[in-house]
Amino acid sequence: MSTGNAAIRGAEHFGTVSVAMVTPFHKDGTIDLKAGVELAGYLVDKGCDSLVLAGTTGESPTTTNEEKINLLKAVRAELGDSVKLIAGTGTNNTASTIELSRLSQDAGADSLLVVTPYYSRPSQEGLFQHFTAVADSVDLPICLYDIPSRSVVPIELDTIQRLSEHENIQAVKDAKGKLPEALQLLQNTDLAWYSGDDPLNLPFLSVGATGFISVIGHLAADRLRALRDAYDQGDLAGAQQIAASLAPLERAQGRLGGVTMVKAALKLRGKDVGAPRLPILEVDPAELDQLEQDLQDAGV
């Protein structure tokens, strides 16, 4: 694993250390914009230079376009240009994705995160045409989100290669985890690469990723910043130590699910962002002691 000079490709649009931010809700289930703005400010103070709003961890399937846009506008109004705002706009409906992408552009997004269409299992040519249609519809940089564990269908290497020729398609959030493919695409395209799976943050840096779009960063954004800085400075041992220290948070996420874990963990640390919306549930009270232990083991 080589070290030093972490990639900066794409950082001007997508940042380097990003959190896929949860969407706070009031007790009655309505969106809590004030808490959303406060959480965004907290994450920026902890070291994030970009945030994903209304992504998977932001409960995009169960929030309306109006809620998504209102959150984006509220965070932009409060934080200004101090952070890059990446709007999650991907759905399994091309027309709906285009509509939300245009709304997000008008609301002040710096870039877009567009997930692979899920459930309908399109062909690779269908994926190519879907992403191309979205990219043609806006004037913003787009990050493809490749997550076959949720979408079932991966974006194959050849499809990403073809999509990279579109001027607006500039990055990939990789939750597929095939590092040799990532390395090949980084060498053969101008795409920026982002780890979309926290346990692989350090390995992705080693093949040329610019940074991370993290879930556990809600609780340890400062440590993720330190991890990237250590790697960039050639301190592999330091980067490895930080990565290992975050394993309890990664285990908790794997056990409970990202939204459930983050919302419960933030509440344990005095930041109540409300419960998830159905069909995602709050953490089982029987799990709270173990979650508290995970947080303590990770030093947060």
Curated annotation (Swiss-Prot):
Pathway listed: Amino-acid biosynthesis; L-lysine biosynthesis via DAP pathway; (S)-tetrahydrodipicolinate from L-aspartate: step 3/4
The answer to whether UniProt assigns keyword Cytoplasm to this entry is yes
Q: Which UniProt keywords apply?
A: Amino-acid biosynthesis, Cytoplasm, Diaminopimelate biosynthesis, Lyase, Lysine biosynthesis, Schiff base
Residue sites binding pyruvate per the record? 57, 213
Q: EC number(s)? A: 4.3.3.7
Which GO biological process categories is it annotated with?
A: diaminopimelate biosynthetic process; lysine biosynthetic process via diaminopimelate
Q: Which residues form the active site?
A: 145 (proton donor/acceptor), 173 (schiff-base intermediate with substrate)
Q: Superkingdom of the source?
A: Bacteria
Q: Which GO terms describe its molecular function?
A: 4-hydroxy-tetrahydrodipicolinate synthase activity
GO annotation, cellular component aspect: cytosol
Question: What InterPro entries does its record include?
Answer: Aldolase_TIM, DapA, DapA-like, Schiff_base-form_aldolases_AS, Schiff_base-form_aldolases_CS
| Site annotation Part of a proton relay during catalysis: residues | 56, 119
Stored Pfam families? DHDPS
The UniProt entry, under SMART domains, shows: DHDPS
Q: Catalysed reaction(s)?
A: L-aspartate 4-semialdehyde + pyruvate = (2S,4S)-4-hydroxy-2,3,4,5-tetrahydrodipicolinate + H2O + H(+)
Q: Where in the cell is it found?
A: Cytoplasm
The UniProt entry's sequence similarity note says: Belongs to the DapA family.
Q: Subunit info?
A: Homotetramer; dimer of dimers.
Q: What does this protein do?
A: Catalyzes the condensation of (S)-aspartate-beta-semialdehyde [(S)-ASA] and pyruvate to 4-hydroxy-tetrahydrodipicolinate (HTPA).
Q: Which HAMAP family does the record match to this protein?
A: DapA
In its UniProt entry, what is this protein called? Answer: 4-hydroxy-tetrahydrodipicolinate synthase
Q: What are the leading ranks of the lineage?
A: Bacteria, Bacillati, Actinomycetota, Actinomycetes, Mycobacteriales
